[in-house]
């Protein structure tokens, strides 16, 4: 299909919404010409949906790899729209970490908006990853981050659009391994029927062991079930099919026991002990084509919290408190702002004012980036932690 772009005078006569669609189309054309990339969606679809830049990939700092050297393909899904998912720090940390491995290619997947969802179902278009535009069903892993319970219906949408059977028991050797992780994975049972395995804990710790086990099983010609048995022996991995769970009348768990030999009786959460050694800092954050919900660089200064508020799930599951080295944070801030062009940096933690070197770090950022006009955001501040100076 050939597209004839309107002249300047013709474009002025168009409505603002149509002008925006033509601008988005020009972005798509430029991506194809410069990168020679195929796109999963046709010209007609991209012109008909809202914010088509959500679906084309090719952003600055997104990771492209040659499939010839790739042993493990990972589709990493945030089950919400692009603008929200692109603001998620946990997903960006793991995307960066996974792609450090030369044998792994991690690509991003987000939930389409209602207009595209409808068209994909009507035209039988499977859900695809942004980088390669390949169908999610062709990957080795589909990792879905579970940040909050309100996204659970989107998890089912993701599986359905990917043309992957909803229930783990109905999947065969051709289906990717579906992994659940994130804060809500600490209570996995509500979604247990839909996931092949859950990772309980902080993602940086044992994914390397999981990928290595998958590679070894693949090279040995092992089956899907053989891999899941090996995965279940990795600390922090919970395979629902290998456990029998019974419930009380009020819906709480009555008993929890493994039904396979070699499977641990309890699954213990995994965490980084030393944030300076186990942490994989982001140097080149992906810069979205359209404005994200949090349009800034995010710098994680510490993990965990000393406060222990009983209403706060994150304060409980991410214990204990672990701080990052202030000099490492300074270098990370320089790299992220230089490589992204963002004009704001957020110092992220559950209670930023409790970071030991906060004053030193803030003063450094003010002095270092004053001429560039970079703003500093301090979320999660407690009113009782302020000093007069």
Mark where each language-model region is:
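Helix-enriched interaction subdomains in cytosolic or periplasmic regions
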Residues: 35-51, 101
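Polybasic, lysine-rich low-complexity intrinsically disordered segments
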Residues: 11-12, 20-21, 34
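Glycine-rich beta-alpha loop elements in corrinoid/cobalamin-binding modules
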Residues: 111-258
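Conserved SAM/AdoMet-binding glycine-rich loop
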Residues: 76-77, 335-389
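Iron-sulfur (Fe-S) cluster-binding segments and ferredoxin-like electron-carrier domains
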Residues: 312-328
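N-terminal pre-triad scaffold of radical SAM enzymes
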Residues: 76-80, 98, 286-310, 337, ...
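N-terminal [4Fe-4S]-dependent radical SAM core
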Residues: 45-75, 82-83, 240, 246-298
